[in-house]
Amino acid sequence: MSELQTTPSPEIRLKENISKKPETMTKIFWEKFSKNKLAILGAVILFIIIMSAVFAPLIAPYPQEQQSLLDKYKAPGLEHLMGTDKFGRDIFSRILYGARVSLLVGFASVVGSILIGTVLGALAGYFRGIVDAVIMRVVDIVLSIPDIFLLITLVTIFKPGVDKLILIFCLTGWTTTARLVRGEFLSLRSREYVLAAKTIGTKTHKIIFSHILPNALGPIIVSATLKVGSVILAESALSYLGFGIQPPIASWGNMLQDAQNFTVMIQAWWYPLFPGLFILMTVLCFNFVGDGLRDALDPKNIK
């Protein structure tokens, strides 16, 4: 007697395909991202830096403000891994605490600017007309002003401080995100699923945030990752010029400002070297991760 062969019904096969699709998309993303060795290296280094900043009070061998004039300009060694500064403060400890400030400014500023830019860009791209014209003219005006001039002007008005810097970067950093999101919405608003949602009477805010926005998240995530590195670099530049984070709060930028004396750079080379290396390494790692995410989230790579 021949064995009965059962085949799954079309409905069962459809359910199986639907349930497997998200897993397949995730797998494709990870395969693409993991092939970028620089992105993986950048992610690992960033994880170490972030964890070191979070647990700085447990890792730092000395309090960040502990001074010892007898240990002034002490070279790197077992007692002070990265040497000391002009007040005898341990540079390694100050770099760990400075990472907390620089990363806080970077992440908080990007979250705020991404939220503002996404909302305004979505409104401009979806409604077009007068809404689009007004928002884009504001974007053009802000982008027409040199970044460093605009930042220094706002810092002078609001006065330096961590919270003030975050606010300033939010107010100046949303424009590129708004332009990016607007472009995505202009290309997605005429898709079939959006037209179908309009036809059945779906509310406008639900179409924007539930139907269109999820399909524009890829470029937004990539932009946010790259912007963190840019904000950290800008904060360091402002602090180096004396317009950013002010002592006694440690940041990588004001540590470089303390070491800008030519004699210090020659005789105590470790003083400017290590803060500069951490700024460079962190910005590069964010760029590496951003490039990896851009390649992995490219729709051409997800079939």
From Swiss-Prot:
Keyword presence, Transport: yes
Keywords: Cell membrane, Competence, Membrane, Peptide transport, Protein transport, Sporulation, Transmembrane, Transmembrane helix, Transport
Organism domain of life: Bacteria
Ribosomal protein listed as a keyword: no
Membrane-spanning ranges: 39-59, 103-123, 138-158, 165-183, 212-232, 269-289
Xref: InterPro entries: BP-dependent_transpt_permease, MetI-like, MetI-like_sf, Oligopeptide_permease_AppC, OppC_N
GO terms of biological process kind: establishment of competence for transformation; peptide transport; protein transport; sporulation resulting in formation of a cellular spore
GO molecular function: transmembrane transporter activity
Membrane topology, from the record: Multi-pass membrane protein
Location of the ABC transmembrane type-1 domain: 99-290
Entry-linked SUPFAM superfamilies: MetI-like
Subcellular localization: Cell membrane
Any one GO cellular component localisation term in the record: plasma membrane
Family: Belongs to the binding-protein-dependent transport system permease family. OppBC subfamily.
Summary of the function given for this chain in its UniProt record: This protein is a component of an oligopeptide permease, a binding protein-dependent transport system. This APP system can completely substitute for the OPP system in both sporulation and genetic competence, though, unlike OPP, is incapable of transporting tripeptides. Probably responsible for the translocation of the substrate across the membrane.
Protein name as catalogued: Oligopeptide transport system permease protein AppC
Taxonomic source organism: Bacillus subtilis (strain 168)
Lineage: Bacteria, Bacillati, Bacillota, Bacilli, Bacillales
